[in-house]
């Protein structure tokens, strides 16, 4: 459950380290984002020499959340952190590597490039 003002870790090599959610894309009164949802973020912390600089406004997809999400088979999955991957307008990642596991729900939401780059899909 990501809402406005939530700070997320970045799970790719774009140079951004921390993102703060400033908008959840979807309907106009949407309050929470979960795994696979696209959010608009401001970069709050960045590594020198990266593609994304501090203060940049970027789109990102949520790949890990602390709040558990239910699956159709009755199981639940949750992670130790909130994390996102910076994406372009065509839903492809801006970085070339993904760090850490991602959820299987990204496959159903057509983020196949992120799923293929991830070291583990849970």
Curated annotation (Swiss-Prot):
The keyword RNA-binding applies. Keywords: Ribonucleoprotein, Ribosomal protein, RNA-binding, rRNA-binding. SUPFAM superfamilies: Ribosomal protein L14. Gene3D superfamilies: Ribosomal protein L14 (2.40.150.20). One of its GO terms (molecular function) is structural constituent of ribosome. One of its GO terms (cellular component) is cytosolic large ribosomal subunit. CDD domains: Ribosomal_uL14. It comes from the Bacteria. InterPro entries: Ribosomal_uL14, Ribosomal_uL14_bac-type, Ribosomal_uL14_CS, Ribosomal_uL14_sf. Belongs to the universal ribosomal protein uL14 family. Part of the 50S ribosomal subunit. Forms a cluster with proteins L3 and L19. In the 70S ribosome, L14 and L19 interact and together make contacts with the 16S rRNA in bridges B5 and B8. Binds to 23S rRNA. Forms part of two intersubunit bridges in the 70S ribosome. PANTHER family: 50S/60S RIBOSOMAL PROTEIN L14/L23 (PTHR11761), LARGE RIBOSOMAL SUBUNIT PROTEIN UL14M (PTHR11761:SF3). NCBIfam families: rplN_bact (TIGR01067). This is Large ribosomal subunit protein uL14. It comes from Desulforudis audaxviator (strain MP104C). The gene is rplN.
């Amino acid at each position: 459950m990501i809402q406005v003002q939530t700070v997320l870790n970045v799970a790719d090599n774009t140079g951004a380290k921390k993102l703060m959610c400033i908008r959840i894309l979807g309907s106009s009164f949407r309050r929470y984002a979960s795994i696979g949802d696209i959010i608009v973020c401001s970069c709050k912390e960045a590594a020198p020499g990266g593609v994304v600089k501090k203060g940049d406004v970027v789109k990102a997809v949520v790949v890990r959340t602390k709040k558990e999400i239910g699956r159709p088979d009755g199981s639940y999955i949750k992670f130790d952190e909130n994390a996102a991957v910076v994406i372009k307008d065509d839903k492809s990642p801006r970085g070339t590597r993904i760090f850490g596991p991602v959820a299987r729900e990204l496959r159903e939401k057509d983020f196949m490039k992120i799923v293929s780059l991830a070291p583990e899909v849970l």
